[in-house]
Amino acid sequence: MPELPEVETVVLSIRDQLVGQNFININVRWPKVLFNFSKQDFLDNLVRRNITNVHRRAKFIVLSFDEDILAIHLRMTGKLYFADGKTNGKHISASMELDNGQQLVFEDTRKFGRFYYYTSQDFLDKKLGIEPLGDSFTADWLIENLRCKKRMIKALLLDQRIIAGLGNIYAVSYTHLRAHETLRYRVF
C-alpha cells in the first residue's frame, strides 16, 4: 500500500512533466475510479485547463487547475505514471491524454483507487489534519493536541483528521518501538 513517502515520490516524479500542461481527453476503463464526478464532468471542467501545480496532501496526489483540483488517492495498489506507448494493460482504470502527446495512466490491480473532483482544496484541508512533514508538526504540537485524548496511540496516529497521511506501517512501527500500543495517551 502506498504510504505518504511513496505518494510524495510519485508527485515528485510527475510534477515537472504535468505543470503547464492541459488534459485533452480521458479514457475511463473502470467507471468507479471517478468517485464524485463523471467522465462528462471531467471533460467539462478539467479539459483544456492549465495544470498550475502538482502536490501532495496527506496521501492524495493533488493536481491544481487554478481553484479546481483533481485529487487522486492510490489506495492499496494504485500507480500513476506516464505511459511509454499504447496503454492496454488489463488493470488500467483510466488514462488521460495531455496536449503535449503524453499519457498519464492510472493503473490499479485491486480497483480501490479513486479520483475526486473539488472546486477548491478547502474540502481536503477541512477534512484532513496536520501534515507530519510540515514545519508546524512539532513535539509541542503533538503533546498539546493529543494530551487529553482517550484513545489508543495507534488509533490516534491513524486518524487522518488529526495527522494527515500516516498509515498503518508507520503507526505500527511507532507503537512497537515505543511499546505504547496498549497504553492510553493520557501519559503526557
Where are these regions (language model features)?
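Single conserved hydrophobic/aromatic residue that forms the stacking wall/gate
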Residues: 176, 181-188
